[in-house]
Amino acid sequence: MKAKTFRYAVLFTLSIILTGIFSDVAAQPRMRFKANKVIRRTAIVLHAAHKQLRLNKHFTGNFARAVAHQRFARRQYMRGNFRSAIHHSRRARMLARMVIQDNKGMPPKEAEFTGDENAGGKDNPTDAELDADLMKDNPNLKFSDEELMDAALDDVDVDEMVNDK
């Protein structure tokens, strides 16, 4: 009787483990799609912020921070860390929106978070944690809006890399 109970316990444990593994694998394509969408929408907002910054030249460092977070989100996307890519791209969009407002512009409709993107939760990282992640990845990073003002922002979107809309 003891051996039978042990066998059932082992089978039950294995089924729980395998269910967790397969549910995570099934969620990957969905997370990839969501991350792609978030990064693409943020790229639109970043381009609008870039345009507004060139017009009014009100430098706060937020534009450079936004570009750095978006580039980090792109790298995370390429590594398959889709959840991290979403969080960093959302942070980039919030910063880009602040740049637009600081430079007396109207944010585009893509600046608003959709219901899908605005998923709150206790396990979401704070802005400080996201900033720390960014600095841990690149400790020599400097945030200068002036340097980026005339730069081409061709590395903030995922469309050039992968077209999986």
Language-model segments: which ranges?
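Short, intrinsically disordered, low-complexity terminal segments
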Residues: 6, 23-24
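Long, charged/polar, soluble alpha-helical segments
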Residues: 25-165
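Bacterial N-terminal signal peptides that target proteins for export
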Residues: 2-12
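Well-ordered, non-transmembrane segments within structured domains
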Residues: 2-3, 20, 85
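Bacterial N-terminal signal peptides
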Residues: 11-20
